[in-house]
Amino acid sequence: MKIQTNAVNVLQRTSAYLKSGLLKETPAWYNVVASIPPSTKFTREPRFKNPSNGHIIGKLVDVTEQPHANNKGLYKTRPNSSDKRVGVKRLYRPPKLTYVEDRLRSLFYKQHPWELSRPKILVENEIGDENYDWSHMLQIGRPLDGESVIQRTMYLIKTKQYGDMVEAYDHARYEFYALRMQEETEQQVALEEAEMFGSLFGVSAIEHGIQKEQEVLDVWEKKVVEETELMAARTSNPAGSWKDDTTLNTAQEEESTTSENLHF
């Protein structure tokens, strides 16, 4: 099958169209593709290192260079399917992108799981983050959360105030603790002042949910008690007595009905 090179030659064909006059205006992507032209090599080459961190992800083993023989006294001259499977499976797989911020986030929320219960607006960090000055942790228009610790840590590393990641993270974490305690103290003082001046606060969303749940549990408890008493009454009396009582009641009702019909 002939190799399709139409997508690769898009820069050459567009240049020819511009030179001949078929295209009047230069496309917006033309200069970008011209500065970084697409590759013309169609053979897949194994990557032995992860380009993001430089770690070795695998290597090809030349079985012909092994000097020893197997248990049968034979020398291997070519790789078998199992040898190829081990190397090829990872060499041609695209490397996983890893970021330092993600490692710091996982560490912070693992140490502080209750921070995940706080309300949070999910937005991309790149949108508007260039306006924040992370020389201090408190930011105008941004609540104090775990992301503040991450960005503060990265700022300390980039400005070389701390050479060690652990020391920078601990410094940002201690700043976060102090600001969180100050925030909770201010909220508690504001609540006590409002109550002192006669403010009345309704139940919170959690308390409202607990009340509704308790109402359902009360109805369930009443129903269970009635069913339990009924089952205890049935098991304490023999089955025949229930049958005899039912037969006796039915006979009495029929007798009373007959007497009423015969009464003039």
From Swiss-Prot:
Keywords: Mitochondrion, Ribonucleoprotein, Ribosomal protein. It is found in: Mitochondrion. GO terms for molecular function: structural constituent of ribosome. The keyword Membrane does not apply. The keyword Mitochondrion applies. It comes from the Eukaryota. It holds the Pfam family MRP-S25. Its main location: mitochondrion. One of its GO terms (biological process) is mitochondrial translation. One of its GO terms (cellular component) is mitochondrion. Residues 233-264 are annotated as: Disordered. InterPro entries: Ribosomal_mS23_fun. Belongs to the mitochondrion-specific ribosomal protein mS23 family. Present with 1920 molecules/cell in log phase SD medium. Component of the mitochondrial small ribosomal subunit (mt-SSU). Mature yeast 74S mitochondrial ribosomes consist of a small (37S) and a large (54S) subunit. The 37S small subunit contains a 15S ribosomal RNA (15S mt-rRNA) and 34 different proteins. The 54S large subunit contains a 21S rRNA (21S mt-rRNA) and 46 different proteins. Component of the mitochondrial ribosome (mitoribosome), a dedicated translation machinery responsible for the synthesis of mitochondrial genome-encoded proteins, including at least some of the essential transmembrane subunits of the mitochondrial respiratory chain. The mitoribosomes are attached to the mitochondrial inner membrane and translation products are cotranslationally integrated into the membrane. This is Small ribosomal subunit protein mS23. It comes from Saccharomyces cerevisiae (strain ATCC 204508 / S288c) (Baker's yeast). The gene is RSM25.
